[in-house]
Amino acid sequence: CKEYGKGIFILVKTSNKSSGELQDLKLENGTTIYEKVAELVNSWGENLVGEYGYSSVGAVVGATYPIQIKELREIMPKTYFLIPGYGAQGGKAEDIALGFKDGIGGIVNASRSLMLAYKSDKWKDKYSEKEFGKATRAEAIRMRDELNKEIID
């Protein structure tokens, strides 16, 4: 990362339901694989902390696991979190807020809930399939406001 001025995100605890099949396995010392990977991410990024207090080595931490989000923020206090799973996968804004510190430190990803917003109960009566872009925009604004309320307020 340092040599090329780039960043990287490492899969730590992903949002998919089957993530636990591997990431929740216990090591001999009793820690889980995701905890060990988090410790590695933290150590790899120690010497790569930038101007805003975060490392260029980031971690993917799923919104669908709020207990782990909080735990992983403690293990990786200077790591940017890429947080998938908000919306269609069931991740909630109040859970995602646990991955932020002072309103920063995370990038929230939502895909299906934006791409298919025109089909959702919230927007299907207002936007047609041809207006999917408008529905996507409306949902993105709604999500932004919901996240800001939990993260910043």
Where do the protein language model's features map onto the residues?
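Surface-exposed amphipathic alpha-helices with a cationic face
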Residues: 1-2, 42-46, 70-76, 144, ...
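Generic structural signal for well-ordered, non-membrane alpha-helical segments
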Residues: 30, 34, 65, 89, ...
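Short, low-complexity, polar/charged sequence segments that are solvent-exposed and flexible
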Residues: 2-6, 27-31, 78-81, 100-103, ...
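Conserved anion-binding
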Residues: 1-58
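A C-terminal functional module that forms or caps the active site or interfaces directly
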Residues: 59, 63-109, 113-120
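A short, terminal or domain-edge coil/loop segment
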Residues: 10-21, 109-121, 143-146
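C-terminal helical cap(s) of enzyme catalytic domains, especially alpha/beta-barrels
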Residues: 96-105, 116-153
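Generic structural signal for well-ordered alpha-helices
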Residues: 34, 38, 42, 69, ...
